Structure formats: C-alpha cells, structure tokens
C-alpha cells in the first residue's frame, strides 16, 4: 500500500479496497515501526483517525475532491491546530498554535488526513537535519547518512513510505536538496505561489512552501491544492488558479511524436553547474539523465550563470539579516521558551534566547545583526541585494535560449551524520546549485535520477529542473516525462 501513488491510493479508496481510516492506520503503524529514523516529532493517532473518519464520510456522500482521504505529513514549520508547532526548536518546544497555516488549511479542506509533524533543522536553518532540537533524522537509504535539510523529516518520511506525501519549505534549497538526498521528488514553486501565512518565518523574501512526494504527478496534485492567492500573506501573488496536472503525459509541442514527447524542448546546461566541486558519481548520474532527455527528443543547450559562486555569500548576508529581524519576536514574553531564573527583564531576554536557540540559529542571528548594524548595512546588505538582482538577470538571459535549466541539485550525495558539523562553511557550500534559484525567486525541483558510486552506492542523486517564473506546470511536465521513461522515483530503500 505504501508504494502506491496518490492517484492509486485514491482509486483504492473509490473502489472501497480500503477506507481512509484503514489507510491512516496503515501509515501510523509504519511511523511507529520506524521511530529510529526520527522523521516525526509529533504524532497523534486520535487526531489523525478523526480526520480520516470525516474523509470517509465525505467519500461516502460523494462530496470529496481528488485528495480526500489521502494521508500527508506536515513539516513542523507550518503551524497546525491540535499538533505542537515547534520549528525544530527548544524555543517553541511546547507551542500549540490556535490556527492552521494556509497550506495546512487548504490541504485539510481538500480532505487530506494529517499523519503528524516532521522533524526539521531548527527554524529551517540547515542542510542536513542535524540542527534539530529533537535530534538528527536518518536517511532511509543509508541510516549512517543525513537526509538533507531543512525538510529532512519530510524527505525521509516519503522515502521510507511513512507518508505518501509531505509538505516542505525551501529558503535556499530546503525542499530540493533533501529530495535529492532521499530519492524523492520535491518542488519549490515561484516565490509567492504558495502562501507563507502560518509558516514560521526564517527569511521572508526567500521562504516558500511546496510539496514532496514520490513523483512529479503527485506533486502536481498537491500543488493544485496548496497554491493560490492569500490576502493574509503580503507577498502572495494574485494570479488565476491553475491546474498543474494539465500538461502531464502530453507532448511538449502540439502534434509531437509519441516516441519523442519532448521534441522541441530546449534544456539549458549552465557551465557553472558542471565544474570543479561536482562529485564524479553525481556527474555520471546527471549525464545519464540528460541522455534520457535527449532520447525523449529534447535538445541540450549550453548557457551561463556567471554569478553562481556569489550566491553563497549573497545568501548568507540576506537570509541571516532577515532571520535576525524575524527571530527577534522570540523573547520569552509573548510565547516561546522562558528561562526559569533571571534577575530582571533584560536578563530574562538574554537567558531565554540563549537557552531556546541552538548554535546554528545563534550564529545566523549574530551574522544578520552584524550586517544590518550601522556602518555595515551599506557595505554588506545593500551590496548583497544589488548582486541578487544581477543573479536574477543572469537567469533571464539564460532563458532566452532555453525553456528549462538542468543540473545537479547538490554537488555530492548525502554525507555521513556528523561529517560536517564542525565546519559550517562546508555545509553552506552544499547549497551552491540551489541558492541562486531561491535568490531569483524562480521555481525549481529535484527528481531522482540515480545513485552514487562505491561506498555511496546506496545514496540517491537528484536532478534539478529550473523553470522561469510561473512555469511550474511545464516543469512538472518535463519531470513527469522523465519519470515515465525511468524508474528511479519508484525504487525503495532496503527493508522498507
């Protein structure tokens, strides 16, 4: 059952092969049996089964949409009424939200059943899911490896068959990189496509929610429910609703050859994504995927994104600056952790934040406060914003000669748990191929395309697909065509 797609699971519900309650119970048992992965931080079977019973009633009355009765896990950065909403931090360890994030509310309105909240890097700051106050998540493909971050709990849950789908967020690669490391499909939509209301903020000009699942087709179904204008989010885009499944299974160009469904598609390959630093085994998997695309009729076109290397310093000025501002609200007074002993109000602020935040969050708050301080704002923050604009312009120049851009989602496969904990810069470098996409506000996704080599033979590789603004439906079409021709996305870790 856990290997079925969302469409297949819904067909099973419609055929009465199982009920929503039975489906939820199936996944709850799997979650309980896989506690060692540490993918979930909060599960409440009573709440889950109550939602499943409501879904069964809707299905019986013929009132259900295409997602009704299907289980989903939510990254613990989305506030969720009834479940704790911690953002992976001691600061919010016991926080109970009085409302649902828009993403949660929309998926619940579509009839989806919440299985629980998934583990994550604290306040979404990390690339390995080792920065969680609740301990690291293990990669189901190789439990000595990280699952990626910050949406590592979500990627591990989908890969291990603990949930058929999960929500994630992506600020600098936090959907795409863990999707790559765990061998699942994940998409970061265009900035503003998915509401940030109720999504605990890290960097407001970068944060974007998106779906994670086994396939592009499943992600398209989820995005149909998640995307759309929300007046409660000032950055939400006012655009007509779309059906993100509308191009799936169709030829790229009208009248195209069924044997060459992607004839006419131009794939841009940035030279900067295939240079020094890209592991040989990752390069081999990406090259093989590109050959599959050529066999499907696509044409490979060289392009250049010359400011790719600058995306790391630019991101690590802008994101910490915004985090410094956003996290100032956690002071121990209004909500969040409060120190047990303190002398006065200022001491309470200091101790509450010192005790509540982990090392990586403190590091980024300090960096952000520094770059926003008097005398440094112009030299760092404003300069970073200027280069950010140039990075976005570079993408637009590249898109003049191609329809989508492809390359690796990460320069390496997943590394061992603890391998980079003492060197944050090496951790930051792992996001070299995803950061610029976030800085430009473009949509990007990762699809499974193979595995590493040698000692890394059990560790997945993800192909990154980057589209122009609002091109999610076409990107999903391109990913879906690849997945119809390959089986990387349906492979499962041993023992699952």
Curated annotation (Swiss-Prot):
Heterotrimer of A, B and C subunits. Allows the formation of correctly charged Gln-tRNA(Gln) through the transamidation of misacylated Glu-tRNA(Gln) in organisms which lack glutaminyl-tRNA synthetase. The reaction takes place in the presence of glutamine and ATP through an activated gamma-phospho-Glu-tRNA(Gln). GO terms for molecular function: ATP binding; glutaminyl-tRNA synthase (glutamine-hydrolyzing) activity. Signal peptide: none annotated. One of its GO terms (cellular component) is glutamyl-tRNA(Gln) amidotransferase complex. It catalyses: L-glutamyl-tRNA(Gln) + L-glutamine + ATP + H2O = L-glutaminyl-tRNA(Gln) + L-glutamate + ADP + phosphate + H(+). The active site is at 75 (charge relay system), 150 (charge relay system), 174 (acyl-ester intermediate). PANTHER family: GLUTAMYL-TRNA(GLN) AMIDOTRANSFERASE SUBUNIT A, TRANSAMIDASE. This is Glutamyl-tRNA(Gln) amidotransferase subunit A. The gene is gatA. One of its GO terms (biological process) is translation. It comes from Burkholderia pseudomallei (strain 668). Pfam families: Amidase. It is an enzyme of class 6 (ligase). It comes from the Bacteria. Keywords: ATP-binding, Ligase, Nucleotide-binding, Protein biosynthesis. Its EC number is 6.3.5.7.
